[in-house]
Regions:
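Short beta-strand segments
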Residues: 40-75, 93
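A short local loop/turn or secondary-structure capping micro-motif enriched for an aromatic residue
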Residues: 63-64, 77-81, 149-150
Length: 161
């Protein structure tokens, strides 16, 4: 079955994969995908030429067809992060929020993996380049658990092939 496109929260493009895709084949759980689709901003860490980290706020969307996280933004192909990924594909993305202040409850998803710089432009010449992250390690906190005692929330970590 072909992939379906739609609009997610905030009017962002959402790509759905084939209906035959099972959760076991997906790098993210259903709850993690829902969390990502509800967020508009993440922080992308890449490696600069001198080996130091660069961390920038970025737009994002989950690509269920490929099981990747696509980083989007204006003039992406001219950005330092795009050049960093072109040179060294190691990257990490953190998406977090405060779910509650009473009691204090935070949630986050950290995705470490291999990133690729994907050039692109539309017929009008606009830059449509993206950074595509292929998850290799996923850390989540407060995503899978129902609201409850915050001190019982545990970090979940898993490595992917």
């Amino acid at each position: 079955m072909a992939a379906e496109s739609g609009t997610g929260p905030g009017g962002r493009q959402r790509v759905r994969g084939p209906a035959s895709t099972t959760e076991e084949q997906m790098p993210l759980t259903g709850a993690e995908v829902e969390y990502l689709e509800a967020q508009q901003l993440g922080r992308l860490a890449t490696i600069q030429p001198d080996g130091s980290p660069q961390v920038k706020p970025v737009g994002l969307r989950y690509n269920a067809e490929l099981g990747t996280i696509d980083i989007v933004g204006l003039r992406m192909s001219a950005s330092q992060k795009f050049r960093n990924v072109s040179r060294d594909g190691r990257a990490a993305l953190v998406v977090d929020d405060i779910a509650s202040t009473q009691p204090w409850r935070v949630r986050f998803l950290e995705i470490r993996g291999i990133a690729e710089a994907v050039p692109g432009s539309d017929p009008g010449g606009a830059d449509t380049a993206i950074i595509r992250i292929h998850p290799r390690r996923v850390l989540s906190f407060g995503i899978e658990e129902p609201p409850g005692e915050p001190h019982q929330t545990r970090l979940r970590t898993r490595d992917l092939p």
